């Protein structure tokens, strides 16, 4: 059976393939091979650049261009050839090394230095840099732009709904009012913090041999400062150098990276659930699309499927990421292979998140505020004014203020008349009575509408 979006086992490459297609060039087997091939080529070029020390003097500029073309022109036919070599070697990096050696054999001058391909390297020297660059590209080209889009969309919602009063619910029960804009601002601020953190996370790489000590390098060329060469090579990719490792780069930065992503995802799950709840309360309506169907049997249904889809995929993403957070920083002694299969699922974890990000944006785009329902719910809950009344009573030294309001309001149907009658009975200045009577569930919103003007 040919592999298509219909025959793929994973919905990442099946049902949701249109949402994850940009990740294929990065996290597919083809992508992984190309990243690793590039590192092998760049390492060979680095060796060539040390020609005066290593006595390599016959490599011309055209050969350097040829090496670059091997990466630039890398295609599926090349990838299949590497996989066929791997069937014999049962070792992916060795297969890649043999492929590159076969390629450079086309050049007489490069053929003379073919044994400098993969010189001094352990497989992890190549793999760890590849993963670093894959994560960097995914972050800079896909994840952060989507986060920015979500955050920017929330910011627009903040000011669009700045003056829409909202009955707050603590423990699911009526509480001091806010505004819809302020409640969205809470999520905006939380997500923006994670955006800034993710952008600044240092992505690390290493190239220092089998156990991190340049043993083979120094055996061949003891007078060369391989530590400095390692640093120069790693930083040339725009990533940070880890000078102290075992055979593997310890993956702490991946744990940091996914900790940030997982927290952003968790905040977004919180947002999805709140939006789901507001839709359920009829605070938001969803724009309908004529040809869409909400239920196979209930024709009237318009379900919040985008927020539900987003929540579900974020859960899957976090499950994988949280496993990686606790698994990847641990390796037995100088290394064990249990991280290898886990690392190959980095793209899967990110893919579920990307699906979720697109879903939440789709859901937000369908929302329409239902102001009448917001006001209707507020009007049913005049008892929330017990908070400002008892607070002002305390200001004027009235004893048992809290207890008196508790007796008046708790578990009872309270309306405007009941509240105003109670206010009239208070021994406080008439101006304060007037101010209290001007308070309603609709305008008792504190500074909710003002403080959001300070968001950046």
UniProtKB/Swiss-Prot annotation:
This protein's GO CC annotations: cytosol
Subunit: Homotetramer. Residues from neighboring subunits contribute catalytic and substrate-binding residues to each active site.
Gene3D superfamilies assigned: Fumarase/aspartase (C-terminal domain) (1.10.40.30), Fumarase/aspartase (Central domain) (1.20.200.10), Fumarase/aspartase (N-terminal domain) (1.10.275.10)
Example of a GO MF term: (S)-2-(5-amino-1-(5-phospho-D-ribosyl)imidazole-4-carboxamido) succinate lyase (fumarate-forming) activity
Domain of life: Bacteria
Coiled coil: none
Pfam family, one: Lyase_1
Enzyme Commission (EC) number: 4.3.2.2
Native source species: Buchnera aphidicola subsp. Acyrthosiphon pisum (strain APS)
Family that this chain belongs to: Belongs to the lyase 1 family. Adenylosuccinate lyase subfamily.
InterPro entries named in the record: Fumarase/histidase_N, Fumarate_lyase_CS, Fumarate_lyase_fam, Fumarate_lyase_N, L-Aspartase-like, Pur_lyase, PurB_bact, PurB_C
Keywords, in A-Z order: Lyase, Purine biosynthesis
GO BP, sorted A to Z: 'de novo' AMP biosynthetic process; 'de novo' IMP biosynthetic process
Protein known as: Adenylosuccinate lyase
């Amino acid at each position: 059976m040919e592999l298509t979006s219909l025959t793929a086992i994973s919905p990442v490459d099946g049902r949701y393939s249109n949402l994850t297609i940009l990740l294929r060039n990065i996290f597919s087997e083809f992508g992984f091979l190309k990243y690793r091939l590039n590192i092998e080529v760049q390492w060979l070029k680095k060796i060539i650049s040390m020609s005066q020390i290593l006595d390599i003097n016959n490599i011309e500029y055209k050969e350097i261009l040829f090496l670059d073309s091997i990466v630039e022109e890398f295609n599926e036919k090349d990838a299949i050839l590497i996989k066929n070599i791997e069937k014999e070697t049962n070792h992916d990096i060795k297969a890649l090394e043999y492929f590159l050696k076969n390629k450079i054999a086309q050049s007489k001058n490069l053929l003379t230095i073919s044994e400098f391909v993969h010189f001094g390297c352990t497989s992890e020297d190549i793999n760890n840099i590849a993963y670093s660059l894959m994560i960097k590209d995914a972050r800079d080209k896909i994840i952060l732009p989507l986060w920015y889009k979500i955050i920017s969309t929330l910011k627009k919602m903040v000011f669009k709904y700045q003056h829409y009063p909202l009955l707050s619910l603590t423990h699911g029960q009526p509480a001091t009012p806010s505004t819809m804009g302020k409640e969205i601002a809470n999520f905006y601020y939380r997500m923006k913090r994670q955006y800034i953190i993710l952008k600044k996370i240092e992505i690390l790489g290493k190239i220092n041999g089998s156990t991190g000590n340049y043993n083979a390098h120094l055996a061949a060329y003891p007078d060369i400062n391989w530590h400095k060469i390692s640093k120069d090579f790693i930083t040339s990719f725009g990533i940070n150098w880890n000078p102290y490792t075992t055979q593997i780069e310890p993956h702490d930065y991946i744990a940091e990276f996914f900790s940030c992503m997982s927290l952003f995802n968790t905040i977004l799950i919180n947002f999805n659930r709140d939006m789901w709840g507001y839709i359920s309360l009829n605070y938001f309506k969803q724009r309908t699309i004529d040809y869409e169907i909400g239920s196979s049997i209930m024709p009237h249904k318009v379900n919040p499927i985008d927020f539900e889809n987003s929540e579900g995929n974020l859960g899957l993403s976090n499950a994988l990421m949280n496993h990686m957070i606790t698994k990847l920083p641990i390796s037995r002694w100088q290394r064990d292979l249990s991280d290898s299969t886990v690392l190959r699922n980095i793209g899967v974890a990110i893919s579920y998140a990307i699906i979720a990000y697109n879903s939440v944006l789709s859901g937000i785009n369908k929302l329409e505020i239902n102001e009448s329902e917001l006001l209707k719910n507020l009007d049913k809950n005049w008892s929330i004014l017990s908070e400002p009344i008892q607070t002002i009573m305390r200001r004027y030294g009235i004893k048992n203020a809290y207890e008196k309001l508790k007796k008046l309001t708790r578990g009872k149907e309270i309306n405007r008349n009941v509240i105003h009658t109670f206010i009239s009975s208070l021994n406080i200045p008439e101006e304060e009575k007037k101010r209290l009577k001007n308070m309603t569930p609709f305008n008792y919103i504190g500074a909710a509408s003002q403080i959001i003007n300070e968001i950046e």
